[in-house]
From Swiss-Prot:
Pfam families the UniProt entry points to: Profilin (PF00235)
Cell location: Cytoplasm, Cytoskeleton
Organism of provenance: Oryza sativa subsp. indica (Rice)
CDD domains, sorted: PROF (cd00148)
Main location: cytoplasm
TM annotation in the entry: none
A single cellular component GO annotation: cytoskeleton
PROSITE patterns the record matches: PROFILIN
Gene3D superfamilies found in the cross-reference section: Dynein light chain 2a, cytoplasmic (3.30.450.30)
Keywords: Actin-binding, Cytoplasm, Cytoskeleton
Identification of the protein by name: Profilin LP04
Similarity section: Belongs to the profilin family.
Tree of life domain: Eukaryota
UniProt GO molecular function: actin monomer binding
Length: 131
């Protein structure tokens, strides 16, 4: 299965009539493996900041998580495994695998729990596959 198919079929899937606003799979170096058409253009330093928080949990909390110039307030996650952020009625979930970052961005009516489930389920599967 191609990386794009993982985004199209597993991240942008419908759940209870809702779907993510945008999603992507990127390498730890920030290179895009696959993304939805409306995924925001991000800066390399934004991915560097996310990777740093996985290595040093809590490093993003004082400044927030930035992606595509949008600032998300960092909320509870799993240190070193999942980062979750909130902005208004939406937010972001980032799951780290051995080789990649799985990113999901949502807005109402999708709930944070639905976004987390979609992103983390694919991330867990890719970890099991050694990716």
């Amino acid at each position: 299965m191609s990386w794009q198919a993982y985004v199209d079929d597993h991240l942008m899937c419908e759940i209870d009539g809702n779907h993510l606003t945008a999603a992507a799979i990127v390498g730890h170096d920030g290179s895009v493996w696959a993304q939805s058409p409306n995924f925001p253009q991000y800066k390399p330093e934004e991915i560097t900041g996310i990777m740093k928080d996985f290595d040093e949990p809590g490093s993003l909390a004082p400044t927030g998580l930035f992606l595509g110039g949008t600032k998300y307030m960092v909320i509870q996650g799993e240190p070193g495994v999942v980062i979750r952020g909130k902005k208004g009625t939406g937010g972001i979930c980032v799951k780290k695998t051995g080789l990649s970052l799985i990113l999901g961005i949502y807005d109402e009516p999708m709930t944070p729990g639905q976004c987390n489930m979609i992103v983390e389920r694919l991330g867990d599967y890719l970890i099991e596959q050694g990716c």
